């Protein structure tokens, strides 16, 4: 009651004519964090549902937690194993915090691994939230509309697809590009045709490739270099991957990679909740999976003596790189994806096909899910257009078939 009374007392100052009317978006954002919006439908409701945008976004945000927490643990585990092999710790305040809270770099300690991983991920997330939130609030204030809860999701998704060692100034630059160029210049939430989180990562990928790809960015240990499992497969074939990791290692997430993308199991836990609550589209996920599996099997059947990626089975494509994360959390973005039911299947299928094509055919990009989703975002409006037009023509033919009989009965 104390929070509600305080907010009610402050509310008049933020309405039109009040002292702080320009900052109503900030007041509204704080109010809706603690309480549901007071607006209700007073006339006939065309959409009947007990869930609003805030609950949807918070649910998606919570569904990333399994991947987030395991990602922090795995980032620390990979670093501590490297330190145990003789590589040095990176030092700085992270080392001081780790020693104060965990006392060692023991890779056998769950707590030590989690603390070290958290010292890398949490700053990334906080910088993402602060900088991206600043741009969200700035555009909301200038346009006079509410701050949307969608940034809760954008911020965590963006942070989870970055390597743990990325410089924080690049984190800020990437989320700025993703929010401003990927969303706000098109009108804000609901009007963007590109996924903002992937747009920001794509900017970093092409502008600063040394800090977001390669062999030295995945494990937070001084002097350590090591390719991801997907890069190893692209360079040396599946035999080299299987010597280093089992399929279960990759499925559970005990491999180097971006913070939130390594554990397919943790990602699928979040996917189950999204599907049960019907927040994410099963059609898109199914389309992505089927497109990937069929294309991978086609390349496996064709084979190649010069390109080892031809021989990667579909079940390895599933657990390596960011495929699972992209399929569950990125491809299902309701704003930038197709909206018609058959369009969702085709949209997802296109992503799955292009992911494997980029991974196998283009040696410059061992990871293909990011570019595949962004390309599919560009095609989504056209996909929906063709399906809508086909539906209109089908209905017109059906109406034309019934109209003569109707006219005769009337006469």
Curated annotation (Swiss-Prot):
Gene Ontology annotations for the cellular component aspect, listed alphabetically: plasma membrane
Known cofactor(s): FMN
Pfam families: NQR2_RnfD_RnfE
Residues recorded as bearing FMN phosphoryl threonine in the entry: 228
Subcellular location: Cell inner membrane
Reactions mediated catalytically: a ubiquinone + n Na(+)(in) + NADH + H(+) = a ubiquinol + n Na(+)(out) + NAD(+)
Molecular function as annotated in GO: FMN binding; oxidoreductase activity, acting on NAD(P)H, quinone or similar compound as acceptor
Family statement: Belongs to the NqrB/RnfD family.
Self-association state and partner proteins as the record states: Composed of six subunits; NqrA, NqrB, NqrC, NqrD, NqrE and NqrF.
Biological function: NQR complex catalyzes the reduction of ubiquinone-1 to ubiquinol by two successive reactions, coupled with the transport of Na(+) ions from the cytoplasm to the periplasm. NqrA to NqrE are probably involved in the second step, the conversion of ubisemiquinone to ubiquinol.
The protein's name in its UniProt record: Na(+)-translocating NADH-quinone reductase subunit B
Organism: Chromohalobacter salexigens (strain ATCC BAA-138 / DSM 3043 / CIP 106854 / NCIMB 13768 / 1H11)
Gene it is expressed from: nqrB
């Amino acid at each position: 009651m104390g929070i509600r009374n305080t907010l009610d007392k402050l509310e008049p100052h933020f309405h039109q004519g009040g002292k702080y009317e320009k900052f109503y978006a900030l007041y509204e954002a704080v109010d809706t964090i603690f309480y549901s919006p007071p607006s209700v439908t007073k006339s006939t409701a065309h959409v009947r549902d007990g869930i609003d945008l805030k609950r949807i976004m918070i649910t998606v945000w919570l569904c990333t937690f399994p991947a987030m927490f395991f990602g922090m643990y795995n980032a620390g585990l990979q670093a501590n194993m490297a330190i145990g092999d003789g590589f040095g710790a990176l030092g700085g305040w992270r080392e001081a915090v780790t020693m104060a809270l965990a006392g060692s770099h023991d890779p056998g300690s769950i707590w030590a691994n989690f603390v070290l991983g958290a010292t890398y991920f949490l700053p990334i997330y906080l910088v993402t939230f602060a900088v991206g939130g600043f741009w969200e609030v700035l555009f909301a204030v200038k346009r006079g509309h509410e701050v949307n809860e969608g940034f809760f999701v954008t911020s965590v998704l963006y942070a989870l697809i970055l390597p743990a060692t990325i410089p924080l100034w690049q984190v800020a630059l990437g989320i700025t590009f993703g929010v401003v160029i990927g969303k706000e210049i098109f009108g804000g939430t609901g009007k963007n045709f590109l996924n903002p989180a992937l747009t920001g990562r794509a900017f970093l990928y092409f502008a600063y490739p040394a800090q977001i790809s390669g062999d030295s960015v995945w494990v937070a240990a001084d002097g350590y270099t090591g390719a991801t499992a997907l890069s190893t497969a692209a360079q040396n074939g599946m035999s080299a991957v299987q010597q280093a990791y089992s399929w279960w290692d990759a499925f559970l997430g005990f491999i180097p990679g971006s913070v939130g993308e390594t554990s397919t199991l943790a990602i699928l836990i979040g996917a189950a909740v999204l599907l049960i609550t019907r927040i994410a589209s099963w059609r898109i996920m199914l389309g992505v999976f089927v497109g990937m599996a069929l294309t991978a099997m086609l390349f496996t059947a064709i084979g190649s003596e010069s390109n080892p990626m031809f021989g990667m089975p579909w079940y390895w494509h599933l657990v390596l790189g960011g495929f699972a994360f992209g399929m569950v959390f990125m491809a299902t973005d309701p704003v930038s994806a197709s909206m018609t039911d058959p369009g969702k299947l085709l949209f997802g299928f296109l992503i799955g096909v292009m992911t494997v094509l980029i991974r196998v055919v283009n040696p410059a990009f061992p990871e293909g899910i990011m570019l595949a989703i962004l390309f599919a975002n560009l095609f989504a409006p056209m996909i929906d257009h063709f399906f809508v037009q086909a539906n209109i023509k089908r209905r017109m033919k059906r109406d034309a078939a019934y109209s003569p009989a109707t006219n005769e009965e009337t006469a």
